Structure formats: C-alpha cells, structure tokens
Amino acid sequence: GSDGFVTQTNDDQTGTVMRFRDMIDGTSNVIALGEKRLDDRSLGNYQGDDNEGYTSGWDHDVIRFTNVQPRVDSNNGGWGEQRFGSIHSQMFNALFADGSVRPISYDIDGNLFSLLGRRNDGQAVSPP
C-alpha cells in the first residue's frame, strides 16, 4: 500500500522518503508494526506466509494488513492469511509510530482498525 507506515514504491520512486511529518494523523494513531497471525500447527514447517526471514522485503511473510480483522493464531493447517494476530487469546500487541506498544483486541471495530493502518487519511480516531 501507499498510505501506511511502511509503503511500497515503484522503481521511479526510488529514494522517496516518508517522514514523520507526513503522518498527518499523528504518530499515536498509526500502527507501525504488530504481531502476525500464524498457523501454530505448521510452525517449523512450510507456511506460505511464514517461510522467509524478516529481511525478505515486500513479501507476504512480513506484510500485514489492517483491512482484515485481526485473529488469534489458528491450528487448522492453513496460513495466517496475512492478518495481524498472535497466540494471545484476546489480543495482539502493536507498536505505534510514537513508540508506544498497545494491545489491540480481536474485537476491534473494523473501520477503526483500518484507519489505524493509514498515516494520512485525516480521520480523527481514538486508538485503544
């Protein structure tokens, strides 16, 4: 995407820098990183979204999206579905752009969660 804390650029945008001042929503309203949902039955084996290291770049192993509801880890033999999530039964931890770490409930309103993944939508939110 092009409106999150981490953005993908085209070849003609090489060298483009996103600055904190570009986060018009405020750094306390933007998720920078978070735990990722996995299939715990497949840990140590191939999982399509957990088979590369963290340095693999723009890859579905390291990218998660806020346009899908976060979920607790699964044990059904599937992938993590590129969702945020964790083994915690009620929430996952997210690092916000201001440096704070906050728990995010799996029951978070979908619209609010989506807005927390955008740095420049201009929407006022009250993060959890």
What label would you give each PLM region?
Residues G1-P128:
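Surface-exposed loop/linker segments characteristic of extracytoplasmic
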